[in-house]
A protein has these predicted regions:
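Histidine-acidic metal/acid-base catalytic patches
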Residues: 2-3, 13-17, 49-166
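Active-site groove signature of glycoside hydrolases
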Residues: 1-8, 29-39, 137
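Basic- and aromatic-lined ligand-binding clefts that recognize polyanionic substrates
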Residues: 28-62
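Short, surface-exposed loop/turn motifs that are enriched in glycine and acidic residues
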Residues: 8, 41-48, 73-76
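An active-site-proximal structural segment forming one wall of the substrate-binding cleft
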Residues: 10-27
């Protein structure tokens, strides 16, 4: 194992301990853990958690009503298990918000809905049938882009027979 990998492992342990400390001391605040995106092996930064297993481990190790999940679908979209794998693998009752942006399925990018290849109708069907009770939040472009994207997303939900509170 390279020294760099040992340092990254130690940093992950320290970060995990720090999160536990934050939850102990800030018991009146809500902390959302986002599923991040994987990075190439030689990348300078490796985000945590960047896959389903890491995300599950955080929730198994830190049992607190103050730790909830922020599900970023465009990060999940280019993960090998995809959006469906995350929705089926996580307890969606732990999900406080779904962060929405389109993606090309190849790398980290926050695109306006309809410009990438996320199947938003299927995404809404999966999430709305999973026990999710939180809110959706757009995470792409300008305010005008997000308002326009909101209409596109509502249309995709409606096509699936899903009424989203607007």
């Amino acid at each position: 194992m390279h020294l760099r990998h040992l340092i990254l492992i130690l940093l992950e342990i320290l970060l995990f301990d720090y999160i536990v400390s934050v939850l102990l001391y800030l018991k009146y605040f809500l902390l959302l853990l986002e599923n991040l995106n994987g990075e190439p092996e030689l990348a300078e930064v490796h985000y945590m958690p960047d896959n389903l297993e890491d995300t599950q481990e955080y929730f198994e190790q830190i049992q607190s009503p103050n730790l909830r999940w922020s599900f970023t679908i465009n990060h999940a979209h280019f993960d090998p298990i995809g959006i469906k794998g995350f929705v089926e693998g996580m307890d969606m009752c732990l999900c406080e918000e779904v962060r929405v942006a389109d993606n090309n399925g190849e790398y980290e990018i926050h695109m306006k809905p309809g410009t990438g290849n996320v199947d938003f109708g299927e995404m809404f069907r999966l999430i709305e049938s999973s026990g999710f009770k939180g809110h959706y939040m757009n995470g792409f472009g300008s305010l005008d882009d997000m308002l326009e994207g909101r209409e596109y997303l509502l249309e995709r939900a409606f096509e699936q027979g899903i009424g989203i509170n607007s």
